[in-house]
Structures are given as C-alpha cells and as structure tokens.
Amino acid sequence: MQQFSTVPALRNEIISLLVEGGIDDDCYIEMLDYTIELFESHGLGSEYYGYHNINHELEVTYVTLLAAKLDSISNKITKNDLKYLYTAALFHDFDPQKSVDKPHEESVLRFISLDKNLRELIKNSNLDIEIVKALILRTTYPWTGNFKENAEKQINQ
C-alpha cells in the first residue's frame, strides 16, 4: 500500500479499478472527488491525527475493489454489486461530528441520509441508498452483542 499512500495516487488507482470493472460513469468519479473534498474540508484529510482519515477511507475502497476484481474470476460479484461495494466502502467511516477517532455507524448513516449532494450522487448512480446503508451497518465492529443486535434491527427495517 506504500506506493499508493498519497490521496492523488489512491484516487488514480481507484479510478483504474472502477474502469477495469466496467464502471466508467462520471457519477462514481464525482462521488470519489466529493468524498475527498468532504474529508479534507472537515479536517479529516491526510494530516488528521487519527486512523479514520481520507487515506483510510480510500485504502478501504481500493482494497474492496481489488478483492472484488479477484473474486470476479468466479463471477460471483456482479457489476451492480461492485457499484454498491464501492459506494459503501467510500463512505463507511465518514462521521464529521465524531468526538473520538472511531466513527459511529449511526452518525455515518445520518450523514448519508441528510447530505443533499451525496443523496443526489447516489440517485444519479441508480443505487438504492438503503442497500448502501445496510452494507455500512454490516461493518459494525465487533459483530457481537448490542452492536450486532442494533445493526441487524436497522438492516431489517
């Protein structure tokens, strides 16, 4: 990952993997650029002291696309699946109001639901925002006890 440790390098690699996966609609690049802008404008750019900064978000997105590319050999992940995985990975930890470094999934979902620009980007990509939110909820860690129960309850709604 060291060779892609800058935001521009990660951005370029993500775009390359999207194109390789047959996803070349402008809305996905707009989503990527909007994410970078959001993180940086909320003080969560590369200089942010904590782990959950723009680099983490882009690295997770990159690794998600890379894993999906490897799995595409078995044809289990469809192009549509890839669009959902990309979108959920891109926003899985965005919580600008966080008081500690670990984001809270409910805050992430609230942001996704209320941010007008992001809702428009998701709409333009023909994705169901509820599926994106369910995928993000499934990143809850640890997946036990109250965390698991609360996430499953929200997913089932």
Task: Please provide the spans of the model-predicted regions.
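Non-catalytic interface/linker regions that flank or bridge core catalytic/transmembrane domains
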Residues: 1-45
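Short, well-structured alpha-helical segments
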Residues: 28-36, 54, 58, 82-86, ...
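Glycine-/proline-rich flexible loop or hinge segments
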Residues: 39-50, 89-93
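Alpha-helical phosphate/pyrophosphate-handling elements in metalloenzyme active cores
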Residues: 46-84, 113, 118
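Histidine-centered active-site/metal-ligand motif
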Residues: 52, 56, 92, 102-105
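His-Asp-centered metal-binding catalytic motifs of divalent-metal-dependent phosphohydrolases/nucleases
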Residues: 60, 80-99, 108, 133-142
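Structured all-alpha helical bundle cores of eukaryotic regulatory proteins
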Residues: 102-117
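Histidine/acidic-rich helix-loop-helix segments that form or flank divalent-metal centers
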Residues: 119-157
